[in-house]
Amino acid sequence: MSAAEDTRSKTDDQLKDSLLELKKEQFNLRFQAASGQLENTARVRTVRREIARIKSVRGERNRAPQAK
């Protein structure tokens, strides 16, 4: 199962919680990068993409009832 399918299978509350958690992680990663303590630089990119994926799914769900 792809990451997008995993994200779509979550409920709205789970998506909200995941988004909040990822934003906190992104904040911490930004500070680690600024202070030179960041070891896994690829994690910044991964977190950013996961946030975008969640926002995309939430947008799809918001637009879906309007299309019908």
UniProtKB/Swiss-Prot annotation:
Q: Which domain of life is it from?
A: Bacteria
One annotated GO molecular function is: structural constituent of ribosome
One Pfam annotation, family name?
A: Ribosomal_L29
Q: Which GO terms describe its biological process?
A: translation
Q: Which UniProt keywords apply?
A: Ribonucleoprotein, Ribosomal protein
The record's listing under InterPro entries reads: Ribosomal_protein_uL29, Ribosomal_uL29, Ribosomal_uL29_CS, Ribosomal_uL29_sf
GO CC field: cytosolic large ribosomal subunit
Question: Which family, according to the similarity comment?
Answer: Belongs to the universal ribosomal protein uL29 family.
Protein's UniProt name = Large ribosomal subunit protein uL29
Q: Which organism is it from?
A: Rhodospirillum rubrum (strain ATCC 11170 / ATH 1.1.1 / DSM 467 / LMG 4362 / NCIMB 8255 / S1)
